[in-house]
Amino acid sequence: MNRIRIHVLPTNRGRITPVPRSQEPLSCAFTHRPCSQPRLEGQEFCIKHILEDKDAPFKQCSYISTKNGKRCPNAAPKPEKKDGVSFCAEHVRRNALALHAQMKKTNPGPMGETLLCQLSSYAKTELGSQTPESSRSEASRILDEDSWSDGEQEPITVDQTWRGDPDSEADSIDSDQEDPLKHAGVYTAEEVALIMREKLIRLQSLYIDQFKRLQHLLKEKKRRYLHNRKVEHEALGSSLLTGPEGLLAKERENLKRLKCLRRYRQRYGVEALLHRQLKERRMLATDGAAQQAHTTRSSQRCLAFVDDVRCSNQSLPMTRHCLTHICQDTNQVLFKCCQGSEEVPCNKPVPVSLSEDPCCPLHFQLPPQMYKPEQVLSVPDDLEAGPMDLYLSAAELQPTESLPLEFSDDLDVVGDGMQCPPSPLLFDPSLTLEDHLVKEIAEDPVDILGQMQMAGDGCRSQGSRNSEKGSAPLSQSGLATANGKPEPTSIS
């Protein structure tokens, strides 16, 4: 028996039919760098790199630029002839636009005869007596009578049209006042010289403007160079730029030459002064800068005149006079003239801020003495009646004994060779009286001793009674006792 095999094909029921994907065009096979442009049909490169394939039906565009003389690098299809000219798509488009513009220019506009023929159909005919042929002949006759020449006119192109000055209409108002021989073409010698002078002045101003422009460009490039050098200096460090250890031998030599060239271009001494004067004269000669320089110079000089000669001193800030002639300015309030003396007047200006009545240093009045010494007090009467035995003799006043340290500030030390001034803390003006009393006692010791001998025993009783009264002035006097011996107190 023959066996029948039945193959059951799987069904697509319940399955999603996949959408066929459109085949993406392959990218260019340029090897030097990845190119994402699609390939040309049947080729391995895009239109930009198709010249890499020597077998491709393309060659370089035949267009050559008139500015720099370079040939277009784009690809163009090979012509049928071997030496034929072929252009790329861009230059084909440009040639088509240029040809279209040229055809527009060469194609003349509608002629006058054609326009009249087109308008003749709108003309009114009298009772239909005129025919189109008669109207055509009438239009031709009018054109023939009004034509400029008997011959046939050629179409007028753009190059044949009159090119006038666009500002001629604006200048037509003043045309009556102008010279009627302005366009005659014949000039006198004076007119030629005047015209040439105006042209030279104009040319000079143009050259000056160009020079200023070049100066501006130089300053701008120098500023950029200094800025870049500063950034590089901050990034790399000073040792790599100026230090000899961070430079090569050739770089050191170049740096040395640059420094020598910089010193060579500098001017010194008289040459520098002459160069500055030359720059000032050039500034005065230029238009615009002359007025500014003149204004700056005149504002810096004093306006006063001495013997019909202007003062050459520099004026003070915000004023027009120098320090010597500032009082001539009636509006200023900062200076006054010195009053001087009755014999010799003085007009030297002095600032008001120093005093209400300012004076120059020659006539300045010194202020009164602020320090006044104190007056010596008179000797009171109750001290004269004191006991005589309380005073010291001349022998006792001799400095035979060493004084304590509290009196050392008031004495002269012979051994040290220097003098110590009295201490201001020990100064007491009330002790001047006691100082005079001690001096009087030291100068006249004999009288004191005589009075003591003449006094009897009876006087001693009286002196003992008065001793209690004299205790008070004794405490104020310049005498003190220490260890039973009288010692003088500190006297300043």
Swiss-Prot record:
Protein's UniProt keywords contain Secreted: no
Main location: nucleus
Pfam families reported in the protein's UniProt record: zf-C3Hc3H
Alphabetically ordered keywords of this record: Chromatin regulator, Isopeptide bond, Mitochondrion, Nucleus, Phosphoprotein, Ubl conjugation
Start-end of Basic and acidic residues biased regions: 135-144
N-terminal signal peptide: none
Modified residues (Phosphoserine): 147, 149, 168, 172, 175
Covalent cross-link (Glycyl lysine isopeptide (Lys-Gly) (interchain with G-Cter in SUMO2)), residues: 78
Span list, region Disordered: 127-182, 455-492
Single Gene Ontology BP annotation: chromatin organization
Subcellular location per the Swiss-Prot or TrEMBL entry: Nucleus; Mitochondrion
Residues carrying Phosphothreonine: 131
Region (Required for interaction with other NSL complex members) location: 308-364
Biased composition (Acidic residues): 167-178
GO cellular component annotations of the record: histone acetyltransferase complex; mitochondrion; NSL complex; nucleus
Coiled coil spans: none
Subunit: Component of the NSL complex at least composed of KAT8/MOF, KANSL1, KANSL2, KANSL3, MCRS1, PHF20, OGT1/OGT, WDR5 and HCFC1.
Function: Non-catalytic component of the NSL histone acetyltransferase complex, a multiprotein complex that mediates histone H4 acetylation at 'Lys-5'- and 'Lys-8' (H4K5ac and H4K8ac) at transcription start sites and promotes transcription initiation. Required for NSL complex stability and for transcription of intraciliary transport genes in both ciliated and non-ciliated cells by regulating histone H4 acetylation at 'Lys-5'- and 'Lys-12' (H4K5ac and H4K12ac). This is necessary for cilium assembly in ciliated cells and for organization of the microtubule cytoskeleton in non-ciliated cells.
Family matches, as PANTHER family: KAT8 REGULATORY NSL COMPLEX SUBUNIT 2
Name of the protein this chain belongs to: KAT8 regulatory NSL complex subunit 2
Lineage: Eukaryota, Metazoa, Chordata, Craniata, Vertebrata
